[in-house]
Amino acid sequence: MEEHDIRMALDRHWAASAAGDQVVEHEIYQDHAVCTYPQSGEVIYGRHNLQALRSHHPGKPSGFEVRRITGEGNVWVTEYVIDYAGESVYTVSLMEFVDGQVSRETQYFSNAFDAPAWRAQWVGREG
């Protein structure tokens, strides 16, 4: 699959995710795809389980913003923010493609936090 085609598939995937379209969102995954959440130690085996897990999430997102997609060849990274009941969850998704579909995904999640005062002299602020 060409990089342009992968990028189009990713755009479709994230748009479907933002819209809550579970069927289209999960078309990007191979049937035997594996998704890991390193922070919790969880591994989700197979597209069916991944779609079921996401379909049963107790909090529906109130916002979804893709900040950046970058990649080359078969490895792509997406940075995005999901809002759950006013809480922003900053997310990084690493996807590995085989035969045009995601075979492996790793996702990292972090809530927003206040910047420590001691760093103020060396940093700027977004926004």
Which ranges hold each PLM region?
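Hydrophobic pocket/interface hotspot
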Residues: H13, E25-H26, A33, G46, ...
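A solvent-exposed, acidic/Ser-Thr-rich amphipathic alpha-helical stretch
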Residues: E3-D5, Q22-G73, D114
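Residue-level structural signal for beta-strand termini and adjacent loop
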Residues: N49, I82, Y108-S110
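Short beta-strand segments that buttress and anchor functional surface loops
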Residues: V77-A85
